[in-house]
């Protein structure tokens, strides 16, 4: 009988994993920590409201057989030092807790962003491809920093199985973050001359892959992505969106202004991933025995369907009917101002003719 600890246990993927573990007779107990209460409760789950930076998690993890580290700030924060403190120093604290607990397995979810978005990326990216995350994108920088931290920790703890899953962009009905909200914009901003394909990992496959990691010995890094990729044009077609194309220099300048002013959800470094492809190969994990049930198109379709009827502009998200009413109100005000201006011009012209 095993005891599994999970950080970030209140997230949807973690909850799906807990549900899977709940049904496994070999799992006796699940220890979950998060700063937010989980939406669902499970018989085997012992929940602790803790930040991953809290030193008390070492006591909570005592006696666990495996730790799944999912807690990580995805949506970029204006306070980048705080974001790094949670993501990197929080992970360092988790590793300390794993060491003290006697756990023999650690599963960590990294991301395709750790490879970076570069014009000379391998196609496809394999686990042997260099990690060159764009350091002007805090989320990517932290994923890379944590991977390097894990590599060093693994060297000092060779008896612990350390699994690093590099997820593709996770999409599905329950995903709600700055990436998914990009597709809720009335128009999709694009860099002129660039149309990179993308991969989307379905949330259900993401959860199932974590269960697979717990029930198999997978030491090292694994790309976790479906077989297919989607072209930029097909994404626009499926989403029913049109683009606003801007030159690269203009796009980065506007993104920097918007981010510094607190109007945008992500820093300018995100734009690199809208320019250069970061397409991964899943050969290694498939050869290990994992089977994907969903394609990139499935993940995209589910995300779009779940969020249909919503519009996001910068940091503001609203129902589509509210957006349209505000647009119509602005149009009405604009027409009224324009009409008033024209009437005044006409009145002045008539007055001058009388003179």
Question: Could you tell me what each predicted segment is?
Answer:
Residues 4-23:
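N-terminal Rossmann NAD(P)H-binding glycine-rich loop of SDR-like oxidoreductase domains
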Residues 39, 45, 49-89, 97, ...:
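NAD(P)H-binding glycine-rich loop region in Rossmannoid oxidoreductase-like domains
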Residues 93-138:
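Conserved Rossmann-fold NAD(P)-dependent oxidoreductase catalytic core, especially the SDR/UDP-sugar
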Residues 135-163:
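Active-site Tyr-X1-5-Lys
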Residues 153-203:
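NAD(P)-dependent short-chain dehydrogenase/reductase
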Residues 203, 233-234, 262-291:
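Conserved C-terminal active-site "lid" loop/helix of NAD(P)H-dependent oxidoreductases
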Residues 207-268, 310-318, 345-355:
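Mid/C-terminal beta-alpha module of Rossmann-like enzyme folds, strongest
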Residues 296-355:
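Amphipathic terminal alpha-helices
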């Amino acid at each position: 009988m095993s005891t599994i600890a999970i950080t970030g246990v209140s997230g949807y993927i973690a909850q799906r994993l807990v549900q899977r573990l709940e049904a496994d007779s070999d799992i006796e107990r699940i220890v979950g920590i998060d700063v937010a209460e989980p939406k669902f409760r499970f018989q085997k789950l012992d929940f602790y409201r803790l930040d991953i930076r809290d030193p008390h998690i070492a006591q909570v993890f005592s006696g666990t057989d495996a730790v799944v580290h999912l807690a990580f700030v995805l949506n970029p924060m204006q306070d980048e030092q705080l974001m790094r403190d949670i993501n990197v120093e929080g992970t360092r604290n988790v590793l300390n807790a794993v060491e003290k607990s006697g756990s023999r397995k650690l599963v960590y979810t990294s991301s395709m962003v750790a490879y970076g978005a570069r014009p000379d990326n391998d196609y496809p990216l394999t686990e042997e491809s260099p990690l060159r995350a764009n350091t002007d994108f805090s989320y990517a920088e932290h994923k890379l920093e944590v991977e390097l931290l894990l590599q060093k920790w693994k060297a000092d703890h060779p008896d612990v199985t350390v699994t690093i899953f590099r997820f593709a962009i996770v999409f599905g009905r329950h995903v709600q973050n700055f990436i998914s909200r990009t597709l809720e914009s009335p128009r999709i901003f694009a860099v002129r001359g660039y149309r990179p394909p993308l991969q989307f990992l379905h949330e259900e496959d993401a959860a199932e892959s974590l269960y697979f990691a717990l029930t198999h010995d997978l030491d090292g890094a694994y790309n976790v992505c479906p077989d297919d990729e989607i072209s930029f044009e097909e994404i626009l077609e499926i989403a029913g969106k049109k683009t606003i194309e801007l030159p690269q220099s203009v796009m980065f300048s506007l993104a920097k202004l918007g981010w510094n002013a607190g109007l945008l959800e992500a820093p300018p470094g995100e734009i690199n991933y809208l320019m250069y492809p970061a397409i991964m190969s899943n050969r290694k994990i498939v050869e290990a025995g994992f089977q994907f049930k969903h394609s990139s198109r499935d993940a995209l379709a589910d995300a779009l369907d779940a969020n249909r009827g919503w519009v996001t502009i910068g940091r503001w998200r609203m129902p589509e009917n509210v957006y349209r009413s505000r647009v119509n109100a602005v149009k009405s005000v604009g027409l009224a101002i324009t009409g008033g201006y024209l009437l005044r011009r006409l009145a002045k012209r008539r007055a001058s003719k009388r003179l």
